[in-house]
Amino acid sequence: MSPQTADAHGDRARPPAPDSSPTPGSSPTPGSARAGGPPCAGGPPCAGEPPCAGETPYDRATAHLDAPLAVVDLQAFDANAADLVRRSKGKPIRVASKSVRCRALLERVLAREGFAGLMSFTLAESLWLARSGFRDILLAYPTADRAGLSELTAEPQLAAAVTVMVDDPAQLDLIDAARPDGAPGGAEVRVCLELDTSFRLLGGKVRVGARRSPLREPAQLAALARAVVGRPGFRLVGLMAYEGHLAGVGDEVAGKPVFSRTVRVMQAAARKELARRRWEAVRAVRAVAPRLEFVNGGGTGSVQHTAAEAAVTEIAAGSGLYVPRLFDNFRSFSGRPAALFAQPVVRRPGPGVVTVLGGGYPASGAAGADRLPVPYLPAGLRYDPQEGPGEVQTPLLGPAADGLRIGDKVWFRHAKAGELCERFDALHLIEGDRVVDTVPTYRGEGRTFL
């Protein structure tokens, strides 16, 4: 079953619920028993209707558990992993740990063919993962963690497992100052340089993409590469170029055809410009460091495009394993929602309304409706526009509310991937309609790095 469907005009819908349920957020068929009749009280689904409380595999699997809780559908997770490998066209995928935030699931995906190495988000996380047995960890962001740098440079095994990100000579100075003896020497630090990938128009007056590295031109990268190579205690091993405006911006947003076409035009031009500049940057850096080990690029939304570039040796991806709601809007791939959270119904204020506990878990980024979790199951629920998702309680409107009882679960999808794990101590791993394991998140292990 394809997790996303297209109508006759090619417009993509949201991923349907398990067992081919209609799109989340849609209302039941007018006039049906569930649209206007009494609550279904856990009876069999009405023909052609979305499942109500207790009817989904997630409800059956967690019937013995109280919400709030979070689950990962392992069949969906594994299918998403296989799709990432298919799209990477033989190039290894480095897993973005921030998009998973669960050691057990990092181990699971790294055991699969086609995945190699981690991309971490803080030095403290990197050191913890290295001490836990993970190897080949690329820290994707520069660090100012002096205590962590002191630890890294004092232990050759840690230094061999972790590669730090550098885009400024001052970061090299900070690393040297953090060495236990305060001077160069000791463990050799592995270094990766980052290329800015943003798309510039009108002589730089218009920028599309994240503000990341100050290193934009090949000559700038070559100059810093020479500084690294010529400095004792450092070894230049990699180059990274993360194209967030290509990998994380959907190009087929439901109900926004003009915006979607504009995004596609922008992304086509940006991909062409970046491919040329990345090739030149890699050539410039390899002239200084011929034994460069890797060139990393990509992101879930651009895996197949980045993999087609000869200059790139590996692809970064992570969100594509959980497939949060922000990744519903891509023409080039379809994913299966794998990570969900459930909130319990605690009130029934009136017809067509239920209230669940909590639920106000917005994602990072520019504030907007797309950063909110979306009610997923049962289908046909929406937020009250005057309240939205709340800190302690969330009212939900729609005909599906009348089929819910006190204590029933409402399932949500987070807007982003790993940020869900900052709200829950554990993930219940589901296969079919069974919980087969319960594993701690980073938070559940007492590790809240950001």
Residue ranges: model-predicted function:
Residues 1-30, 39-154, 445-450:
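A charged N-terminal "starter" segment
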Residues 5, 348-450:
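C-terminal accessory subdomain/extension
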Residues 96-243, 248:
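Active-site-proximal beta-alpha core segment in soluble small-molecule metabolic enzymes
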Residues 102-104, 129, 245-249, 302-305, ...:
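Flexible loop/turn segments at secondary-structure boundaries
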Residues 184, 197-323:
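Active-site loop/helix belt of alpha/beta enzymes
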